[in-house]
């Protein structure tokens, strides 16, 4: 369950300054609304960069799946770091859209401002 404005690519993937995208789990309120009408499993998305918060939402049953895109670009080893007890080392997406959306718009591929840090860490988990 998500929110998007497809009038322009820049509006499809909202930056941190977007009025609906200010808090962690910002779109989960839409899951809450959908839940009123169905009991099917719901996948939440939107600013899910805090592993403790994500775990709380899953454990409470608010969502049954957590979807992440930019967060996994920011740190492809997010799950591995959690499993190895290194959650504090996770590079959290800052929703700047500089290289992820910016790369798409410039036809340069999908990247992240953390790419250099991730490359340096590769294999060190």
Label each residue range with its predicted role.
Residues 1-125:
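Flavin-dependent oxidoreductase catalytic cores
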């Amino acid at each position: 369950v998500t929110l998007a404005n497809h009038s322009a690519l820049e509006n499809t993937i909202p930056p941190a300054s977007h009025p609906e995208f200010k808090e962690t789990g910002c779109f989960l309120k839409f899951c809450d609304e959908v839940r009123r009408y169905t009991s099917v499993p719901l996948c939440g998305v939107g600013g899910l960069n805090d592993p403790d918060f994500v775990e709380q939402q899953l454990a409470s049953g608010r969502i049954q799946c957590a979807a992440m895109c930019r967060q996994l670009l920011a740190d492809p080893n997010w799950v591995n770091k959690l499993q190895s007890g290194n959650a504090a080392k996770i590079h959290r997406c800052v929703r700047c859209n500089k290289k992820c959306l910016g790369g798409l718009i410039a036809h340069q591929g999908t990247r992240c401002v953390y790419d250099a840090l991730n490359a340096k860490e590769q294999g060190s988990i």
